[in-house]
Amino acid sequence: MEHQGVRKTYRYRLDPTPEQAQVLEIVIWRCRTLYNVALEQRKLWWERGQDDGASYYQQKAELPGLKAACPEFGAIHAHVLQDVMLRLDRAFQAFFRRVNAGETPGYPRFQGRGRYNSFTFPEYGNGAVLDGRVLSLSKIGRIHIRLHRPLEGRPRPLPSAGKRMGGRCVSLARRRRCNHFLAPDKKPG
């Protein structure tokens, strides 16, 4: 039997400088703003009956134009902005899945300060790299991290930075091999 990996996520506290903390807040604020603007755009498309343009790929394709029109979004890594669009698309997919299942759907919500408090680098190594006790985030800088337990396995996507319990933290996903599996002694039932 081939060994399969197990995905495990580790959460660590960040120790940013005051300037880095301010940059992290600005990135989260801009990501939340982009999410809300994209949600408003989809809502307008839907009300006008132009639902053919309301897709992740359409909105993702508009990001370069947004960065040209609003240079402050150019200060954020492109994959982080694309992940914001993916978050919104997943919210709509869940909405339509519930509609089709006959459940109470719950239209995707506009995100306030307390509801949208993180951002994600979808690819490890492309914008986010851990080097010892320092996390390098593209266009943000090198932030010290409190490694209170060792990381196991090889890096996987989704280094996610945000705020939890009043402090800033990062979640790092890792894939590690399992050297043992429990096999059942007898057939279930």
Q: Language model features by range: what are they?
A:
Residues 1-189:
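Nucleic-acid substrate recognition interfaces
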